[in-house]
Protein backbone atom coordinates (compact mmCIF):
# COMPACT_ATOMS: atom_id res chain seq x y z
CA UNK A 1 0.00 0.00 0.00
CA UNK A 2 1.28 3.45 -0.83
CA UNK A 3 0.02 6.95 -1.30
CA UNK A 4 0.89 9.34 -4.11
CA UNK A 5 0.45 13.02 -3.33
CA UNK A 6 0.69 16.05 -5.55
CA UNK A 7 3.16 18.72 -4.53
CA UNK A 8 4.12 21.83 -6.43
CA UNK A 9 7.70 21.92 -7.74
CA UNK A 10 9.31 23.53 -10.78
CA UNK A 11 9.15 21.52 -13.98
CA UNK A 12 12.46 20.16 -15.29
CA UNK A 13 14.66 22.40 -17.38
CA UNK A 14 15.03 20.96 -20.86
CA UNK A 15 16.46 22.28 -24.07
CA UNK A 16 17.12 21.40 -27.68
CA UNK A 17 14.86 18.86 -29.33
CA UNK A 18 13.24 18.04 -25.99
CA UNK A 19 12.27 21.64 -25.19
CA UNK A 20 8.65 21.98 -24.09
CA UNK A 21 6.14 23.07 -26.72
CA UNK A 22 2.87 24.89 -26.06
CA UNK A 23 1.57 24.84 -22.49
CA UNK A 24 -0.19 21.55 -21.80
CA UNK A 25 -1.53 22.22 -18.32
CA UNK A 26 -5.06 21.30 -19.45
CA UNK A 27 -3.91 17.95 -20.90
CA UNK A 28 -3.93 14.64 -19.01
CA UNK A 29 -1.25 12.24 -20.28
CA UNK A 30 -1.57 8.60 -19.24
CA UNK A 31 1.53 6.44 -19.67
CA UNK A 32 1.04 2.67 -19.69
CA UNK A 33 4.20 1.01 -18.44
CA UNK A 34 6.73 2.21 -15.90
CA UNK A 35 10.01 1.09 -17.42
CA UNK A 36 12.64 3.56 -18.61
CA UNK A 37 10.47 4.37 -21.65
CA UNK A 38 7.36 5.10 -19.62
CA UNK A 39 9.22 7.15 -17.04
CA UNK A 40 10.97 9.19 -19.75
CA UNK A 41 7.60 9.85 -21.42
CA UNK A 42 6.22 10.98 -18.06
CA UNK A 43 9.25 13.24 -17.54
CA UNK A 44 8.60 14.90 -20.89
CA UNK A 45 4.91 15.27 -20.11
CA UNK A 46 5.75 16.89 -16.79
CA UNK A 47 8.14 19.25 -18.57
CA UNK A 48 5.25 20.29 -20.81
CA UNK A 49 3.13 21.06 -17.74
CA UNK A 50 0.68 18.24 -18.42
CA UNK A 51 -1.07 16.27 -15.74
CA UNK A 52 0.60 12.85 -15.90
CA UNK A 53 -0.31 9.38 -14.64
CA UNK A 54 1.96 6.33 -14.99
CA UNK A 55 0.37 2.88 -14.69
CA UNK A 56 2.71 -0.05 -13.97
CA UNK A 57 1.52 -3.64 -13.59
CA UNK A 58 4.57 -4.77 -11.62
CA UNK A 59 5.38 -3.89 -8.02
CA UNK A 60 8.29 -1.63 -9.00
CA UNK A 61 9.34 0.79 -11.71
CA UNK A 62 12.21 0.36 -14.15
CA UNK A 63 11.16 -2.60 -16.29
CA UNK A 64 14.31 -4.39 -17.45
CA UNK A 65 16.53 -1.84 -15.69
CA UNK A 66 17.09 -3.52 -12.32
CA UNK A 67 20.12 -2.98 -10.09
CA UNK A 68 20.56 -5.35 -7.16
CA UNK A 69 22.89 -4.40 -4.30
CA UNK A 70 23.92 -7.11 -1.84
CA UNK A 71 26.99 -8.20 0.11
CA UNK A 72 29.02 -5.37 -1.37
CA UNK A 73 28.19 -6.34 -4.98
CA UNK A 74 26.27 -4.23 -7.47
CA UNK A 75 24.56 -6.64 -9.87
CA UNK A 76 22.78 -5.39 -12.98
CA UNK A 77 19.95 -7.76 -13.84
CA UNK A 78 19.28 -6.02 -17.15
CA UNK A 79 21.37 -3.58 -19.19
CA UNK A 80 24.57 -2.39 -17.52
CA UNK A 81 25.41 0.61 -19.71
CA UNK A 82 24.43 2.79 -22.66
CA UNK A 83 26.25 4.38 -25.58
CA UNK A 84 27.30 8.00 -25.20
CA UNK A 85 27.23 8.84 -28.91
CA UNK A 86 23.43 8.82 -28.81
CA UNK A 87 22.76 11.79 -26.53
CA UNK A 88 19.28 11.11 -25.15
CA UNK A 89 20.44 9.18 -22.07
CA UNK A 90 23.15 11.67 -21.10
CA UNK A 91 20.73 14.53 -21.66
CA UNK A 92 18.14 13.03 -19.33
CA UNK A 93 20.84 12.29 -16.76
CA UNK A 94 21.92 15.94 -16.90
CA UNK A 95 18.35 17.14 -16.38
CA UNK A 96 18.08 14.88 -13.34
CA UNK A 97 21.25 16.37 -11.86
CA UNK A 98 23.23 13.13 -12.14
CA UNK A 99 25.98 14.16 -14.55
CA UNK A 100 28.61 13.86 -11.82
CA UNK A 101 27.58 10.21 -11.38
CA UNK A 102 28.40 9.18 -14.97
CA UNK A 103 31.38 6.83 -15.27
CA UNK A 104 33.18 5.22 -18.20
CA UNK A 105 34.75 1.76 -18.32
CA UNK A 106 37.95 1.54 -16.34
CA UNK A 107 41.13 -0.36 -17.03
CA UNK A 108 41.44 -3.79 -18.49
CA UNK A 109 41.77 -5.05 -22.01
CA UNK A 110 38.92 -4.71 -24.39
CA UNK A 111 36.57 -7.54 -25.31
CA UNK A 112 37.93 -10.77 -26.76
CA UNK A 113 36.31 -13.30 -29.07
CA UNK A 114 35.99 -17.02 -28.46
CA UNK A 115 36.80 -18.29 -31.93
CA UNK A 116 37.86 -21.77 -32.96
CA UNK A 117 38.18 -22.87 -29.35
CA UNK A 118 40.41 -20.05 -28.09
CA UNK A 119 39.93 -16.58 -26.64
CA UNK A 120 41.48 -14.20 -29.13
CA UNK A 121 41.92 -10.41 -28.89
CA UNK A 122 39.41 -8.34 -30.79
CA UNK A 123 41.38 -6.62 -33.56
CA UNK A 124 41.92 -2.92 -32.91
CA UNK A 125 39.51 -0.72 -34.83
CA UNK A 126 36.96 -3.49 -35.41
CA UNK A 127 33.43 -2.17 -35.75
CA UNK A 128 30.31 -4.27 -35.30
CA UNK A 129 30.79 -5.80 -38.75
CA UNK A 130 33.77 -4.28 -40.55
CA UNK A 131 37.32 -3.18 -39.76
CA UNK A 132 38.22 0.51 -39.60
CA UNK A 133 41.94 -0.33 -39.62
CA UNK A 134 43.49 -2.68 -42.16
CA UNK A 135 46.61 -4.05 -40.46
CA UNK A 136 44.94 -5.32 -37.25
CA UNK A 137 42.35 -7.04 -39.44
CA UNK A 138 45.01 -8.65 -41.63
CA UNK A 139 46.95 -9.96 -38.62
CA UNK A 140 44.05 -11.07 -36.40
CA UNK A 141 43.86 -14.74 -35.47
CA UNK A 142 40.06 -14.63 -35.18
CA UNK A 143 39.75 -15.31 -38.91
CA UNK A 144 41.59 -17.91 -40.95
CA UNK A 145 43.59 -16.78 -43.99
CA UNK A 146 40.95 -18.17 -46.38
CA UNK A 147 38.33 -16.10 -44.50
CA UNK A 148 40.47 -12.96 -44.83
CA UNK A 149 41.09 -13.52 -48.52
CA UNK A 150 37.37 -14.06 -49.12
CA UNK A 151 36.55 -10.85 -47.23
CA UNK A 152 39.06 -9.01 -49.41
CA UNK A 153 37.06 -9.90 -52.52
CA UNK A 154 34.61 -7.22 -51.38
CA UNK A 155 37.07 -4.76 -52.92
CA UNK A 156 36.19 -6.00 -56.43
CA UNK A 157 32.64 -7.37 -56.12
CA UNK A 158 30.08 -5.14 -57.91
CA UNK A 159 27.02 -3.68 -56.23
CA UNK A 160 24.42 -6.40 -55.66
CA UNK A 161 21.96 -5.18 -53.04
CA UNK A 162 18.29 -5.31 -54.13
CA UNK A 163 15.85 -2.49 -53.40
CA UNK A 164 13.88 -4.55 -50.87
CA UNK A 165 14.92 -5.43 -47.33
CA UNK A 166 17.18 -8.45 -46.84
CA UNK A 167 18.79 -10.28 -43.92
CA UNK A 168 22.09 -8.84 -42.77
CA UNK A 169 23.71 -12.26 -42.92
CA UNK A 170 22.74 -12.91 -46.53
CA UNK A 171 24.01 -9.51 -47.65
CA UNK A 172 27.32 -9.77 -45.80
CA UNK A 173 27.98 -13.32 -47.01
CA UNK A 174 27.50 -12.18 -50.56
CA UNK A 175 30.08 -9.44 -50.17
CA UNK A 176 32.48 -10.68 -47.47
CA UNK A 177 32.00 -14.42 -47.14
CA UNK A 178 30.85 -16.65 -44.31
CA UNK A 179 33.86 -16.24 -42.02
CA UNK A 180 33.37 -12.59 -41.15
CA UNK A 181 29.65 -13.22 -40.67
CA UNK A 182 30.13 -16.10 -38.21
CA UNK A 183 33.16 -14.70 -36.38
CA UNK A 184 32.25 -11.02 -36.11
CA UNK A 185 28.80 -9.98 -37.32
CA UNK A 186 26.73 -12.71 -35.67
CA UNK A 187 28.21 -12.51 -32.15
CA UNK A 188 28.33 -8.71 -32.13
CA UNK A 189 25.15 -7.67 -33.93
CA UNK A 190 23.13 -10.74 -33.00
CA UNK A 191 24.14 -10.32 -29.37
CA UNK A 192 22.70 -6.82 -29.23
CA UNK A 193 19.42 -7.66 -30.94
CA UNK A 194 18.85 -11.14 -29.51
CA UNK A 195 18.49 -12.74 -32.93
CA UNK A 196 20.56 -14.57 -35.49
CA UNK A 197 22.27 -12.53 -38.16
CA UNK A 198 20.33 -14.44 -40.83
CA UNK A 199 16.98 -13.12 -39.61
CA UNK A 200 17.87 -9.53 -38.70
CA UNK A 201 16.77 -6.76 -41.06
CA UNK A 202 19.48 -4.85 -42.90
CA UNK A 203 17.33 -1.74 -43.28
CA UNK A 204 16.20 -1.67 -39.64
CA UNK A 205 19.47 -2.61 -37.94
CA UNK A 206 22.36 -1.55 -40.20
CA UNK A 207 20.98 0.74 -42.90
CA UNK A 208 24.41 2.36 -43.28
CA UNK A 209 25.60 -0.78 -45.08
CA UNK A 210 23.14 -0.11 -47.88
CA UNK A 211 24.39 3.47 -48.10
CA UNK A 212 28.01 2.32 -48.10
CA UNK A 213 27.50 -0.08 -50.99
CA UNK A 214 25.63 2.58 -52.95
CA UNK A 215 28.23 5.30 -52.34
CA UNK A 216 31.49 3.30 -52.26
CA UNK A 217 30.55 -0.08 -53.78
CA UNK A 218 33.04 -1.77 -51.40
CA UNK A 219 32.01 -2.04 -47.75
CA UNK A 220 35.66 -2.38 -46.72
CA UNK A 221 36.64 0.82 -48.52
CA UNK A 222 33.76 2.69 -46.88
CA UNK A 223 34.62 1.38 -43.40
CA UNK A 224 38.33 2.12 -43.67
CA UNK A 225 37.59 5.63 -44.95
CA UNK A 226 35.17 6.19 -42.10
CA UNK A 227 37.79 5.00 -39.62
CA UNK A 228 40.38 7.42 -40.96
CA UNK A 229 37.90 10.29 -40.75
CA UNK A 230 36.94 9.37 -37.17
CA UNK A 231 40.56 9.17 -36.04
CA UNK A 232 41.34 12.51 -37.70
CA UNK A 233 38.37 14.13 -35.94
CA UNK A 234 39.43 12.57 -32.62
CA UNK A 235 42.95 13.94 -33.00
CA UNK A 236 41.56 17.40 -33.73
CA UNK A 237 39.34 17.27 -30.65
CA UNK A 238 42.25 16.08 -28.52
CA UNK A 239 44.46 18.89 -29.84
CA UNK A 240 41.79 21.46 -29.05
CA UNK A 241 41.32 20.04 -25.55
CA UNK A 242 45.07 20.01 -24.95
CA UNK A 243 45.35 23.59 -26.15
CA UNK A 244 42.60 24.69 -23.78
CA UNK A 245 44.11 22.78 -20.86
CA UNK A 246 47.60 24.08 -21.58
CA UNK A 247 46.32 27.63 -21.86
CA UNK A 248 44.53 27.31 -18.53
CA UNK A 249 47.54 25.68 -16.87
CA UNK A 250 49.96 28.25 -18.30
CA UNK A 251 47.77 31.10 -17.13
CA UNK A 252 47.73 29.73 -13.60
CA UNK A 253 51.35 28.47 -13.27
CA UNK A 254 53.30 30.07 -16.09
CA UNK A 255 54.28 26.60 -17.38
CA UNK A 256 53.46 24.92 -20.66
CA UNK A 257 52.47 21.23 -20.61
CA UNK A 258 52.35 20.73 -24.38
CA UNK A 259 53.67 17.15 -24.31
CA UNK A 260 50.70 14.80 -24.50
CA UNK A 261 50.18 11.08 -24.42
CA UNK A 262 48.39 9.03 -26.97
CA UNK A 263 46.08 6.65 -25.16
CA UNK A 264 43.67 4.01 -26.40
CA UNK A 265 40.45 5.00 -28.06
CA UNK A 266 37.83 6.00 -25.51
CA UNK A 267 35.01 3.54 -24.93
CA UNK A 268 31.58 4.69 -26.12
CA UNK A 269 29.89 3.09 -23.10
CA UNK A 270 28.77 4.89 -19.97
CA UNK A 271 26.83 4.03 -16.84
CA UNK A 272 26.09 5.53 -13.43
CA UNK A 273 28.22 5.06 -10.35
CA UNK A 274 25.31 3.47 -8.52
CA UNK A 275 24.18 1.38 -11.49
CA UNK A 276 21.43 2.13 -13.97
CA UNK A 277 18.90 1.65 -11.18
CA UNK A 278 20.15 5.03 -9.94
CA UNK A 279 18.58 6.58 -13.05
CA UNK A 280 15.24 4.89 -12.32
CA UNK A 281 15.33 5.96 -8.67
CA UNK A 282 16.02 9.58 -9.60
CA UNK A 283 13.25 9.62 -12.19
CA UNK A 284 10.70 8.14 -9.79
CA UNK A 285 11.67 10.53 -6.99
CA UNK A 286 11.54 13.64 -9.16
CA UNK A 287 8.36 12.61 -10.97
CA UNK A 288 6.67 12.01 -7.64
CA UNK A 289 7.93 15.36 -6.34
CA UNK A 290 6.56 17.00 -9.49
CA UNK A 291 3.06 15.68 -8.83
CA UNK A 292 3.02 12.80 -11.30
CA UNK A 293 0.62 10.04 -10.30
CA UNK A 294 2.63 6.81 -10.05
CA UNK A 295 0.61 3.59 -9.83
CA UNK A 296 2.12 0.14 -9.28
CA UNK A 297 0.48 -3.29 -9.10
CA UNK A 298 -2.11 -1.89 -11.51
CA UNK A 299 -2.73 -3.11 -15.04
CA UNK A 300 -4.72 -1.60 -17.89
CA UNK A 301 -7.69 -3.60 -19.14
CA UNK A 302 -8.92 -1.38 -21.96
CA UNK A 303 -8.32 1.84 -23.83
CA UNK A 304 -11.78 3.33 -24.14
CA UNK A 305 -13.12 6.54 -25.56
CA UNK A 306 -13.93 7.58 -22.00
CA UNK A 307 -10.40 6.92 -20.75
CA UNK A 308 -8.00 4.24 -19.61
CA UNK A 309 -9.76 1.38 -17.78
CA UNK A 310 -7.70 -0.02 -14.90
CA UNK A 311 -7.76 -3.47 -13.34
CA UNK A 312 -9.10 -2.05 -10.07
CA UNK A 313 -12.23 -0.77 -11.82
CA UNK A 314 -11.25 2.86 -12.08
CA UNK A 315 -11.18 4.81 -15.33
CA UNK A 316 -8.46 7.40 -15.82
CA UNK A 317 -9.70 10.19 -18.11
CA UNK A 318 -6.99 10.64 -20.74
CA UNK A 319 -6.42 13.29 -23.37
CA UNK A 320 -3.25 11.54 -24.55
CA UNK A 321 -1.83 8.04 -24.10
CA UNK A 322 1.67 6.60 -24.49
CA UNK A 323 1.84 2.80 -24.56
CA UNK A 324 5.22 1.84 -23.12
CA UNK A 325 4.52 -1.59 -21.69
CA UNK A 326 6.11 -3.70 -24.41
CA UNK A 327 5.00 -5.43 -27.60
CA UNK A 328 2.47 -7.88 -26.16
CA UNK A 329 0.82 -5.33 -23.86
CA UNK A 330 0.56 -2.67 -26.55
CA UNK A 331 -0.84 -5.12 -29.12
CA UNK A 332 -3.49 -6.32 -26.66
CA UNK A 333 -4.64 -2.79 -25.84
CA UNK A 334 -4.75 -1.65 -29.47
CA UNK A 335 -6.57 -4.73 -30.81
CA UNK A 336 -10.20 -3.67 -30.07
CA UNK A 337 -9.98 -0.31 -31.84
CA UNK A 338 -6.90 -0.51 -34.10
CA UNK A 339 -6.61 -4.14 -35.24
CA UNK A 340 -4.19 -3.36 -38.09
CA UNK A 341 -1.70 -1.76 -35.70
CA UNK A 342 -2.18 -4.61 -33.23
CA UNK A 343 -1.50 -7.22 -35.94
CA UNK A 344 1.67 -5.44 -37.02
CA UNK A 345 2.92 -5.32 -33.43
CA UNK A 346 2.04 -8.97 -32.84
CA UNK A 347 4.16 -9.91 -35.87
CA UNK A 348 7.31 -8.64 -34.13
CA UNK A 349 9.01 -11.75 -32.71
CA UNK A 350 10.34 -11.64 -29.16
CA UNK A 351 13.53 -13.18 -27.81
CA UNK A 352 14.30 -14.52 -24.35
CA UNK A 353 17.59 -14.43 -22.51
CA UNK A 354 18.96 -15.45 -19.15
CA UNK A 355 21.72 -13.61 -17.30
CA UNK A 356 23.81 -15.59 -14.83
CA UNK A 357 25.86 -13.46 -12.43
CA UNK A 358 28.87 -15.11 -10.79
CA UNK A 359 31.56 -13.88 -8.41
CA UNK A 360 34.83 -15.45 -7.28
CA UNK A 361 37.66 -14.19 -5.11
CA UNK A 362 40.67 -13.04 -7.13
CA UNK A 363 42.70 -15.77 -5.42
CA UNK A 364 40.59 -18.44 -7.19
CA UNK A 365 42.03 -17.51 -10.60
CA UNK A 366 45.25 -18.89 -12.06
CA UNK A 367 45.92 -15.39 -13.37
CA UNK A 368 44.04 -12.34 -12.14
CA UNK A 369 41.59 -11.45 -14.93
CA UNK A 370 42.17 -8.16 -16.73
CA UNK A 371 39.77 -8.50 -19.67
CA UNK A 372 36.38 -6.82 -19.76
CA UNK A 373 34.95 -10.03 -21.16
CA UNK A 374 34.34 -11.84 -24.39
CA UNK A 375 31.84 -12.66 -27.11
CA UNK A 376 31.45 -16.19 -28.44
CA UNK A 377 31.67 -16.91 -32.14
CA UNK A 378 31.79 -20.68 -31.60
CA UNK A 379 28.61 -22.71 -31.32
CA UNK A 380 27.45 -23.22 -27.76
CA UNK A 381 24.83 -22.17 -25.21
CA UNK A 382 26.60 -18.98 -24.08
CA UNK A 383 26.83 -15.82 -26.20
CA UNK A 384 29.32 -13.96 -24.04
CA UNK A 385 30.63 -12.85 -20.66
CA UNK A 386 31.12 -9.42 -19.14
CA UNK A 387 33.55 -8.90 -16.27
CA UNK A 388 31.41 -6.30 -14.54
CA UNK A 389 33.90 -5.38 -11.82
CA UNK A 390 36.68 -4.87 -14.36
CA UNK A 391 34.49 -2.96 -16.78
CA UNK A 392 33.09 -0.52 -14.19
CA UNK A 393 34.29 0.57 -10.76
CA UNK A 394 32.31 -0.19 -7.63
CA UNK A 395 30.72 -3.43 -8.81
CA UNK A 396 32.41 -5.80 -6.35
CA UNK A 397 34.21 -5.65 -3.00
CA UNK A 398 38.00 -5.51 -3.05
CA UNK A 399 39.44 -8.92 -3.76
CA UNK A 400 36.42 -10.18 -5.71
CA UNK A 401 35.57 -10.39 -9.40
CA UNK A 402 31.94 -10.12 -10.57
CA UNK A 403 30.91 -11.47 -13.97
CA UNK A 404 27.73 -11.77 -16.01
CA UNK A 405 27.18 -14.65 -18.45
CA UNK A 406 24.54 -14.40 -21.19
CA UNK A 407 22.46 -17.41 -22.27
CA UNK A 408 20.05 -16.39 -25.08
CA UNK A 409 17.34 -18.61 -26.48
CA UNK A 410 18.88 -18.39 -29.96
CA UNK A 411 21.75 -20.47 -28.59
CA UNK A 412 19.52 -23.37 -27.60
CA UNK A 413 17.21 -24.58 -24.82
CA UNK A 414 19.60 -24.06 -21.88
CA UNK A 415 18.09 -20.63 -21.19
CA UNK A 416 14.89 -22.39 -20.05
CA UNK A 417 16.61 -25.13 -18.03
CA UNK A 418 16.02 -25.45 -14.26
CA UNK A 419 18.24 -23.23 -12.14
CA UNK A 420 20.60 -25.96 -10.93
CA UNK A 421 21.10 -27.39 -14.42
CA UNK A 422 21.58 -23.93 -15.93
CA UNK A 423 24.05 -22.84 -13.26
CA UNK A 424 26.10 -26.02 -13.51
CA UNK A 425 26.31 -25.81 -17.31
CA UNK A 426 27.33 -22.14 -17.27
CA UNK A 427 30.03 -22.63 -14.62
CA UNK A 428 31.41 -25.67 -16.46
CA UNK A 429 31.50 -23.62 -19.67
CA UNK A 430 33.32 -20.56 -18.33
CA UNK A 431 35.60 -22.23 -15.76
CA UNK A 432 38.35 -23.40 -18.17
CA UNK A 433 38.20 -20.16 -20.14
CA UNK A 434 38.65 -18.11 -16.97
CA UNK A 435 41.15 -20.42 -15.31
CA UNK A 436 39.16 -20.28 -12.09
CA UNK A 437 38.87 -22.91 -9.36
CA UNK A 438 36.25 -23.62 -6.75
CA UNK A 439 32.63 -22.62 -6.61
CA UNK A 440 31.51 -19.00 -7.02
CA UNK A 441 30.74 -17.14 -3.82
CA UNK A 442 27.81 -15.35 -5.45
CA UNK A 443 25.34 -16.69 -7.98
CA UNK A 444 22.26 -15.00 -9.33
CA UNK A 445 19.99 -15.98 -12.21
CA UNK A 446 17.80 -13.44 -13.98
CA UNK A 447 15.41 -14.69 -16.66
CA UNK A 448 13.86 -12.39 -19.24
CA UNK A 449 11.16 -14.29 -21.12
CA UNK A 450 9.96 -12.99 -24.49
CA UNK A 451 10.80 -9.35 -23.81
CA UNK A 452 13.39 -8.46 -26.48
CA UNK A 453 11.91 -7.37 -29.85
CA UNK A 454 13.74 -8.90 -32.80
CA UNK A 455 14.11 -6.59 -35.80
CA UNK A 456 13.68 -9.24 -38.45
CA UNK A 457 13.38 -8.67 -42.21
CA UNK A 458 10.42 -6.40 -42.90
CA UNK A 459 10.57 -4.67 -39.51
CA UNK A 460 10.41 -1.15 -40.94
CA UNK A 461 7.21 -2.00 -42.80
CA UNK A 462 5.62 -3.34 -39.62
CA UNK A 463 6.70 -0.25 -37.68
CA UNK A 464 5.29 1.98 -40.42
CA UNK A 465 1.90 0.27 -40.18
CA UNK A 466 1.78 0.92 -36.43
CA UNK A 467 2.90 4.54 -36.74
CA UNK A 468 0.65 5.42 -39.68
CA UNK A 469 -2.43 3.73 -38.20
CA UNK A 470 -2.05 5.64 -34.96
CA UNK A 471 -1.34 8.92 -36.74
CA UNK A 472 -4.42 8.58 -38.95
CA UNK A 473 -6.94 7.08 -36.52
CA UNK A 474 -5.72 7.88 -32.99
CA UNK A 475 -3.17 10.71 -33.13
CA UNK A 476 -3.41 11.16 -29.35
CA UNK A 477 -2.09 7.61 -28.81
CA UNK A 478 1.47 6.40 -29.38
CA UNK A 479 3.51 3.23 -28.97
CA UNK A 480 6.98 3.89 -27.56
CA UNK A 481 9.96 1.83 -26.48
CA UNK A 482 12.17 -0.85 -27.96
CA UNK A 483 9.43 -2.41 -30.10
CA UNK A 484 9.75 -0.12 -33.11
CA UNK A 485 12.57 2.41 -33.28
CA UNK A 486 15.64 1.12 -31.44
CA UNK A 487 16.50 -1.24 -28.60
CA UNK A 488 19.12 0.72 -26.67
CA UNK A 489 18.51 2.85 -23.59
CA UNK A 490 19.06 6.15 -25.48
CA UNK A 491 16.73 4.96 -28.26
CA UNK A 492 13.95 4.22 -25.77
CA UNK A 493 14.39 7.55 -23.99
CA UNK A 494 14.39 9.53 -27.23
CA UNK A 495 11.36 7.66 -28.57
CA UNK A 496 9.50 8.17 -25.29
CA UNK A 497 10.04 11.92 -25.23
CA UNK A 498 9.16 12.31 -28.89
CA UNK A 499 6.01 10.22 -28.43
CA UNK A 500 4.91 12.24 -25.40
CA UNK A 501 5.33 15.46 -27.36
CA UNK A 502 3.40 14.09 -30.34
CA UNK A 503 0.36 12.92 -28.40
CA UNK A 504 0.24 16.05 -26.24
CA UNK A 505 0.44 18.25 -29.34
CA UNK A 506 -2.32 16.21 -30.99
CA UNK A 507 -4.50 16.56 -27.90
CA UNK A 508 -3.94 20.32 -27.79
CA UNK A 509 -4.73 20.60 -31.50
CA UNK A 510 -7.98 18.71 -31.01
CA UNK A 511 -9.15 21.02 -28.19
CA UNK A 512 -6.85 24.05 -28.35
CA UNK A 513 -8.80 26.26 -25.99
CA UNK A 514 -10.90 23.88 -23.93
CA UNK A 515 -9.71 23.23 -20.39
CA UNK A 516 -9.63 19.61 -19.33
CA UNK A 517 -12.93 18.90 -17.61
CA UNK A 518 -11.16 16.40 -15.39
CA UNK A 519 -8.42 18.76 -14.22
CA UNK A 520 -9.99 18.93 -10.78
CA UNK A 521 -10.03 15.17 -10.35
CA UNK A 522 -8.48 14.15 -7.03
CA UNK A 523 -4.78 13.50 -7.61
CA UNK A 524 -4.32 11.47 -4.44
CA UNK A 525 -4.90 7.73 -4.73
CA UNK A 526 -4.38 5.15 -2.02
CA UNK A 527 -3.72 1.55 -3.00
From Swiss-Prot:
BP-aspect Gene Ontology terms: heme biosynthetic process
Subcellular localization: Cytoplasm
Bias (Low complexity) ranges: 1-14, 236-252
Gene3D superfamilies linked to this entry: FAD/NAD(P)-binding domain (3.50.50.60), protoporphyrinogen ix oxidase, domain 3 (1.10.3110.10), Protoporphyrinogen oxidase, mitochondrial, domain 2 (3.90.660.20)
SUPFAM superfamilies (alphabetical): FAD-linked reductases, C-terminal domain, FAD/NAD(P)-binding domain
GO CC, one annotated term: cytoplasm
Cofactor notes: Binds 1 FAD per subunit.
Keyword Cytoplasm on entry: yes
Example of a GO MF term: oxygen-dependent protoporphyrinogen oxidase activity
Catalysed conversion reaction: coproporphyrinogen III + 3 O2 = coproporphyrin III + 3 H2O2
NCBIfam families noted in UniProt: proto_IX_ox (TIGR00562)
Family note: Belongs to the protoporphyrinogen/coproporphyrinogen oxidase family. Coproporphyrinogen III oxidase subfamily.
Name the UniProt record assigns to this protein: Coproporphyrinogen III oxidase
Species: Propionibacterium freudenreichii subsp. freudenreichii
Amino acid sequence: MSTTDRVTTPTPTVSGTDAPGPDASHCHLVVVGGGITGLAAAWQGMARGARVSVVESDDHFGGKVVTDRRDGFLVEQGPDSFVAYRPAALKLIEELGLSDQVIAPGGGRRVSLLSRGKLRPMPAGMGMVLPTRMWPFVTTTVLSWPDKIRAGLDLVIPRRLPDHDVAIGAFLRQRLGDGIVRRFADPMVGGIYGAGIDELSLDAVLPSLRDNERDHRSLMVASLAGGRASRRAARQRAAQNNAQQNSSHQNSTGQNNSAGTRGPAASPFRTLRGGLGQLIDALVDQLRAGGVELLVNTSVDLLGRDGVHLSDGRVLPADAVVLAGGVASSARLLRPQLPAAARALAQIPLASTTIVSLAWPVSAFDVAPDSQGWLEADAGPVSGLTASSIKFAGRAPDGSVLMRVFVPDKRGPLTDAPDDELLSAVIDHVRPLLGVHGEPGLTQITRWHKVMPKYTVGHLERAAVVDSTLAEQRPTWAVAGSALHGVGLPDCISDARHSADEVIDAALAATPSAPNRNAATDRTETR
